């Protein structure tokens, strides 16, 4: 989906969905427990936010092949963001939330171009890392240099 389409769907989903929750996991936690475990932790915390607000989750559908440890039925669906509308919606919410965090980071550290690459490992991002080193929000466990820019 284009960024414009995602923004449109983001607004519709937030307005029309019965319930939704987002949990951002910090770069420090990701460095400590790895990206997969951080994703599972985010799923678990998002579920707990809904449960704690009184929503009864009958099944938690997760994109991928792993599931978080939660107190409700859970199902992993590989490539679920291309198959299951609820996972598609969750994916749009998460991506837009992350993009907005990257836009805020761009205001604080404009030399990295976060609003352009949204934190993904593009040539532009690797060039910025080569020129400026990591900023306080970079995941140090991620390969911070690209073989092509060496």
Regions found by a protein language model. Name each.
Residues 1-150:
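RNase H-like, Mg2+-dependent phosphodiesterase core
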């Amino acid at each position: 989906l284009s960024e414009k389409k995602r923004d449109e769907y983001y607004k519709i989903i937030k307005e029309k969905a019965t319930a939704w929750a987002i949990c951002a996991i910090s770069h420090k936690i990701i460095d400590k427990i790895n990206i997969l475990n951080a994703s599972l932790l985010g799923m678990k915390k998002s579920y707990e936010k809904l449960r704690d607000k009184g929503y009864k989750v009958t099944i938690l559908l997760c994109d991928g092949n792993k599931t978080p440890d939660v107190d409700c039925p859970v199902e992993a669906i590989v490539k679920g963001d291309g198959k299951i509308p609820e996972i598609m919606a969750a994916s749009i919410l998460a991506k837009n939330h992350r993009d907005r965090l990257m836009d805020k980071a761009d205001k604080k550290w404009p030399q990295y171009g976060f609003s352009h690459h949204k934190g993904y490992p593009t040539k532009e991002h690797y060039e910025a890392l080569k020129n400026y080193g990591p900023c306080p929000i970079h995941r140090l466990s991620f390969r911070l240099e690209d073989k092509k820019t060496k």
